[in-house]
């Protein structure tokens, strides 16, 4: 089940399905934030796919193609638990599957959940390949440097994220 989330102000970001006219990549989702003053926040406007079939722990590969009008355009991907409980502070928990080979101590400036990539060539389809370890989760999208309370833990066999998550 694909979905669009757009919490930006009207006219800032548009997300729509379009036919590209390209025989190899005939259909695409287009995200246009040319009305924005800066890049779109990770939680404000995105295209996602919800997964409710149930996953098994292991290494998964997410592959897609992206194209941008300008070289250097950032693309981000993460896999998050759909429904979260509130913690003791009254805030919603955030549970993400971890990028494969992430080490919070060795990579203190990197997110363990979010894969960040920059499109190198303008107007050219670029293959993006990301590996996720569904056997581990992190409790925040931020880096350990910006969130010293960042926790990496093994995924429980009956964890809710294995039954209902979405990829962005």
Language model regions located:
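Extra-cytoplasmic beta-strand recognition segments
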Residues: 1, 29, 33-35, 44-79, ...
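Short edge-strand/loop segments of extracellular domains
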Residues: 78-89
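Extracellular beta-strand ligand-recognition surfaces/modules
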Residues: 127-168
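Short beta-strand and strand-turn-strand segments in soluble, beta-rich domains
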Residues: 42-44, 89-116
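Short carbohydrate-recognition loop motifs
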Residues: 13-40
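Surface-exposed coil/turn segments at beta-strand junctions on protein surfaces, enriched
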Residues: 55-57, 70, 119-125, 161-163
